Regions:
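Active-site/ligand-binding-proximal alpha/beta "capping" segment
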Residues: 185-240
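Short pre-catalytic strand/loop immediately N-terminal to key active-site residues, enriched for Gly-Thr
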Residues: 41, 112-116, 233-241
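Methionine residue identity
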Residues: 1-6
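RNA substrate-binding interface of SAM-dependent RNA methyltransferases
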Residues: 101-190
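Boundary-proximal intrinsically disordered activation/regulatory segments immediately upstream
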Residues: 7-64
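Structured adenosyl-cofactor binding patch, chiefly the S-adenosyl-L-methionine
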Residues: 130, 145, 152-157, 218, ...
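Glycine/small-residue-rich loop that forms an oxyanion/phosphate-binding "nest" at active or ligand-binding sites
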Residues: 72-90
């Protein structure tokens, strides 16, 4: 099996080689850095399932297997402690940021305000895939969705969930708010989300989740129309300061879907 490589032009590279070259190994390894991923417009995924899922939605540029690379070379290119033996290099996808005009009935969007941890972002993407949220809007200081750790944590969900980065999340939220869509935010002074009136019957809207340490930024907080709280149990008893943001996201999305199913 030959190394698949299309449209990417690298020096001293013979695409007809049956075995991966040193230049290719070095190039794939360099894609662990965001700078090089952005310059080339590509990203790396590992593992048979993840690669197979992603090739349904992304253009596969390079497919590396034990047939065309040694275990040492795969280890050099891998970002995992225990390489899975299959590596794919994909071209990034250009998706249009959703607008109020194209938001379908029953469609929810998720907005992430400064999520820093790649593992959290990857888990959130995977959670959105489970709960039928297919667009995530991120501030530019949110972790890169093409970071190898994020891609790995999504377990292939990146093939079905579109992740968008915007220069101004407040500006985008204003557009949705003006169009009459609710903007939900998880805040410590929010309303217990398990109270029936906390989540309106209108299913359209944007759910905002904030930074791991600081929560939702002040500029975004001002645009939240429905403040929600995930209560501790028993309510109002001393407990941990906060939930992990990926766990909190899963709880919120599960409750939205539960209430929507109950009302429909």
């Amino acid at each position: 099996m030959s190394v698949m490589l299309m449209h990417i032009h690298l020096p001293h590279m013979n695409v007809n080689n049956s075995h991966i070259s040193k230049a290719q190994v070095k190039w794939v390894r360099s894609l662990q850095m965001k700078k090089h991923r952005d310059e080339q417009g590509v990203f790396v995924a590992e593992g048979e399932k993840c690669v197979n899922d992603l090739r349904q939605s992304f253009e596969l540029l390079m497919h590396i297997t034990p047939d065309n690379a040694s275990s040492t070379e795969i280890e050099q290119m891998s970002s995992l402690r225990t390489p899975q033996g299959i590596i794919g290099v994909f071209r990034k996808r250009e998706d249009q940021v959703p607008s109020p005009a194209v938001l379908a009935d029953g469609q929810l969007l998720l907005a992430l305000d400064g999520i820093q941890d790649p593992g959290n972002l990857g888990t959130i993407i995977r959670t959105c895939d489970w709960f039928g949220i297919y667009d995530i809007i991120c501030t530019n200081d949110t972790a890169d969705c093409y970071n190898p750790k994020v891609v790995q944590a999504t377990m292939g969900a990146l093939a079905r969930v579109r992740v968008h980065y915007v220069n101004s999340l407040p500006k985008l939220l204003e557009q949705f708010q003006t169009a009459g869509y609710p903007v939900y935010g998880t805040l410590l002074d929010g309303k217990n989300m398990y109270v029936p009136t906390a989540i309106p019957t209108k299913e359209k809207g944007i759910i905002v989740m904030g930074n791991e340490g600081n929560g939702i930024s002040e500029d975004v907080r001002k645009l939240v129309t429905h403040s929600l709280l995930i209560p501790s149990y028993p309510v109002n008893t001393p407990t941990s300061e906060s939930l992990n943001v990926s766990i909190a996201t899963a709880i919120v999305l599960a409750e939205f879907r539960r209430q929507h199913n109950k009302k429909s």
